[in-house]
């Protein structure tokens, strides 16, 4: 067992967080990760409506008594999802950890913080991680260019990005992108991360 600021903050055994993954992050996977000692994540927008997310959260509670979280990605667009509805489902479902991604979660921080929810924001640069810290996020997921899905615009690999994040951030951060085994976990910890994000 490795004890870090992230394991203590999230009340997990291992400093491993399952990243939100569209069309994959269902209750079964989240519960399996949480039962193994990491932090499982349900991908919020994989659920078509807030009511569907509420049902998925309830299913996950039936499969694990360990902490798990919900990913909520804020996307630009003309027809935004019902973010207030998803946040209501998260709060009413007793979720205490939310992983945010995409645009800044600043507009949605008040209800999350009022509910006592820990917010981890995915960032592809140190400047975005500093902004996450400034708006009250509890931790950052620092995503190097190796990450899948949404690698950002700066193309900075983790070997450069993680040590810079460690120099600048006061909040704990986890390393994301290219993390897949114990050696990479150890390397991430050596570069200042408090854990890793896989998936």
Residue ranges and their predicted role:
Residues 1-168, 172:
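Active-site entrance/lid segments in N-terminal catalytic domains of soluble metabolic enzymes
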Residues 156-198:
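Catalytic alpha/beta core domains of metabolic enzymes, predominantly
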């Amino acid at each position: 067992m490795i004890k870090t600021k992230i394991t203590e903050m999230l009340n997990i055994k291992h400093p491993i967080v399952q990243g939100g993954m569209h069309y994959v992050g269902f209750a079964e996977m989240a519960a399996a990760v949480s039962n193994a000692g990491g932090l499982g994540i349900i991908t919020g927008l994989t659920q078509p409506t807030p009511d569907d997310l509420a049902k998925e959260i309830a299913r996950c509670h039936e499969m694990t008594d360990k902490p798990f979280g919900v990913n909520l990605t804020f996307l630009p667009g003309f027809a935004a999802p019902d973010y207030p509805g998803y946040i209501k489902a998260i709060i009413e479902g007793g979720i205490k950890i939310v992983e945010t991604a995409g645009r800044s979660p600043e507009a949605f921080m008040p209800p999350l913080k009022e509910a006592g929810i820990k917010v981890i924001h995915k960032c592809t640069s140190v400047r975005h991680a500093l902004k996450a810290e400034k708006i009250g996020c509890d931790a950052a997921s620092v995503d190097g260019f190796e990450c899948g899905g949404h690698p950002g615009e700066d193309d900075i690999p983790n070997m450069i990005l993680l040590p810079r994040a460690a120099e600048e951030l006061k909040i704990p951060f986890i390393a994301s992108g290219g993390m897949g085994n114990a050696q990479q976990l150890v390397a991430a910890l050596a570069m200042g991360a408090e854990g890793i994000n896989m998936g």
